[in-house]
Amino acid sequence: MSTKPVVIRFFAPVIDATVNALMSAVDQKMKQGMKDFVILISSPGGSVIHGLSAYNYLKGLPASITTHNFGSVDSIGIVLYCAGSRRLSVPQARFLFHGVNVQFKGEQNLDEKLLEERLNGLRIDMENIAKVIAANTGKSAKDITDAMFERTTLNPEEAQSWGLVHEIKSELFEAGSEVIAIQFQQQPQQLPKM
């Protein structure tokens, strides 16, 4: 068995398919006795429920998790990044904080109770995200919420001063390491045939 950590390159949005692929890859390697993981992350964000679930899953494992921003970690991607007990970033990276939103489909009718339910859900999501990031940095939940409302972008040095990044490092993994790729490609639209 290799003594090198398992490297997982997560170059994808945080959605059902990619989070399930991440958890499956970790599960499979843990069944093989691996307990040391490096998750390389570059993500535009995505689904709050999937991001919080992935965070809780990775944090709850009897494994060593290192996360490494190799490009841009945005929105709920920051929560996934916080799953690392050791958090690294390349020098040319960024972290984007912004608030949670909800999308309504078509001409959906919303009564007062449904609007209230959606608004309460947004507030709880914001609180949960802020609590996770605050628990893993030197910032308070209010500081994080303010950063989200202000749509704050941090470079690696700023993220390090917040306690979000532990070390700025260009090297992603050792030569000869196994790399598992998780990516998402949207299917191209089919043009009508003539």
Kindly label every feature range from the protein language model:
Residues M1-I76, C82-M194:
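N-terminal organellar transit peptides
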